[in-house]
């Protein structure tokens, strides 16, 4: 439900889908070859490794091929393809950017001579990065458009990665004036958006700070101001939160996490400013009912999402351990998409837990005949954690509540510079007569270079570093 708030009349420039789909025609050299013949050696011999060549940056055909307010970072992409000498490049777009796919593919092929593959499977968010499919198709490089690097580039073994956020320029002045027109000066505001608008958010913050107490919150590893549909910060001492972006999916995440704070939305496309509402009590009631039903289940079904990197094996293992500790019967099912009719086929399963997208349970849980829980809700049902009065929207946050989230400290890989850390520090041990501290085999990272000051034992004694 949204209350439209009066705004000045401003003409919105629309992008023609027809124009975006036209084929790119590159310039030709005297030899009749396309621009892909850009000198890769010559002047590059004295050029810093990461500097984009001038002949790419100043190419007028590139500058005119795509909307000027959408930054597809074409120059950087061409240079990256040349850097890694990629022969086959996979391009992955969210639904809203697919209309530019053919044009971008033509540009990249014309300027680099590579072969491009447009990946057409649905891409809901940054969690859907499909490096597995790209690698299976023999691609050397995957370019993922429209989302931040939720999956680190060093985690995609076997294929190079490039993230293009697609920064979108908006009428920042109109956004700022819309806030001033509707909210009283001196208010404490939090500004959030999707990755496409974080630059505009920073610019707007600088202007709004003259009249308001403005914060751009950060939920690491996300960028300042960035929110996802499953990950949003908990805010303190704020009069309002303003979301810059279209649609409500991402906005609802921050509304669920902060039900007591009034939310507003500014749509940069139609330039409207609206007051937004979310029935948090109805949502809580529905989720608690599902949890209560699942707590009585005799057999669980664990769903691991296979749409890109959506499913987390670490989270799945955490849930398995919880069920095993309770001697619960369960099965594991791999699914790229979760539909009610599919789950109906498993008649002996009493409750489902999906390790894919928490919003699937929140938004669509009531559409399933059996309880469909998120990992957090399953942990409540299995009594591993208490129900939180503020529903946690921390699925990809480093500061998440527990091991039912992928980036929780218990699930993150140990940094390389800490893996060999020697644990020979002060150790306090009770009821041990031997003067040497007892450290478990798995805790000593020294291996054969161990100093011998500890006794590697596996016994009932416990140590507290």
UniProtKB/Swiss-Prot annotation:
PANTHER family: 2-(3-AMINO-3-CARBOXYPROPYL)HISTIDINE SYNTHASE SUBUNIT 1, DIPHTHAMIDE BIOSYNTHESIS PROTEIN. Residues 454-465 have a biased composition (Basic and acidic residues). GO terms for molecular function: 2-(3-amino-3-carboxypropyl)histidine synthase activity; 4 iron, 4 sulfur cluster binding; metal ion binding. It is an enzyme of class 2 (transferase). Residues 1-14 have a biased composition (Polar residues). Component of the 2-(3-amino-3-carboxypropyl)histidine synthase complex composed of dph1, dph2, dph3 and a NADH-dependent reductase. Residues 1-42, 442-465 are annotated as: Disordered. Belongs to the DPH1/DPH2 family. DPH1 subfamily. It comes from Nematostella vectensis (Starlet sea anemone). It comes from the Eukaryota. One of its GO terms (cellular component) is 2-(3-amino-3-carboxypropyl)histidine synthase complex. GO terms for biological process: protein histidyl modification to diphthamide. The keyword Transmembrane helix does not apply. This is 2-(3-amino-3-carboxypropyl)histidine synthase subunit 1. The keyword tRNA-binding does not apply. Residues 15-25 have a biased composition (Basic residues).
């Amino acid at each position: 439900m949204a209350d439209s708030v009066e705004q000045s009349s401003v003409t919105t420039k629309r992008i023609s889908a027809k124009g975006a789909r036209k084929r790119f025609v590159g310039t030709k050299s005297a030899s009749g070859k396309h621009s892909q013949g850009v000198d890769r050696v010559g002047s590059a011999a004295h050029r810093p490794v990461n500097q984009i060549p001038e002949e790419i940056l100043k190419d007028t055909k590139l500058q005119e091929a795509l909307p000027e307010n959408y930054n597809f970072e074409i120059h950087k992409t061409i240079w990256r393809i040349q850097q890694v000498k990629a022969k086959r490049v996979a391009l992955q777009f969210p639904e809203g950017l697919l209309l530019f796919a053919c044009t971008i593919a033509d540009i990249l092929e014309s300027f680099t001579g590579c072969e491009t593959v447009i990946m057409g499977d649905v891409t809901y968010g940054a969690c859907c990065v499909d490096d597995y499919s790209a690698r299976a198709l023999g691609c050397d490089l995957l370019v993922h458009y429209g989302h931040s690097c939720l999956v680190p580039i060093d985690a995609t073994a076997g294929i190079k990665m490039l993230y293009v956020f697609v920064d979108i320029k908006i009428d920042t002045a109109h956004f700022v004036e819309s806030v001033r027109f509707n909210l009283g000066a001196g208010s404490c505001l939090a500004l959030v958006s999707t990755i496409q608008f974080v630059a505009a958010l920073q610019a707007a913050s600088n202007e709004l700070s003259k009249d308001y107490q403005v914060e751009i919150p950060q939920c690491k590893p996300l960028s300042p101001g960035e929110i996802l549909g499953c990950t949003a910060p908990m805010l303190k001492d704020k009069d309002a939160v303003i979301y810059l972006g279209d649609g409500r999916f991402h906005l609802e995440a921050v509304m669920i996490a902060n039900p007591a704070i009034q939310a507003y939305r500014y749509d940069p496309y139609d330039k409207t400013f609206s007051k937004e509402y979310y029935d948090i009590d109805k949502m809580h009631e529905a989720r608690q009912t599902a949890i209560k039903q699942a707590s009585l289940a005799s057999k669980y079904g664990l769903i691991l999402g296979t749409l890109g990197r959506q499913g987390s094996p670490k989270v799945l293992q955490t849930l398995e351990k919880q069920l095993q500790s309770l001697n619960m019967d369960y099965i594991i099912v791999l699914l790229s998409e979760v539909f009610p009719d599919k789950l109906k086929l498993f008649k002996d399963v009493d409750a489902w837990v999906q390790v894919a997208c928490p919003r699937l349970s929140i938004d669509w849980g009531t559409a399933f005949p059996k309880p469909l829980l998120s990992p957090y809700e399953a942990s409540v049902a299995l009594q591993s954690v208490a129900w939180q009065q503020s529903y946690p929207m921390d699925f990809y946050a480093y500061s998440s509540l527990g091991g039912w989230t992928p980036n929780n400290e218990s699930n993150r890989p140990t940094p390389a510079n800490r893996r060999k850390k020697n644990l020979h520090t002060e150790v306090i041990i009770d009821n041990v007569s031997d003067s040497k501290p007892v450290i478990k085999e798995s805790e000593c990272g020294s291996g054969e270079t161990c100093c011998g000051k500890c006794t590697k034992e596996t016994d009932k004694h416990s140590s507290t570093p």
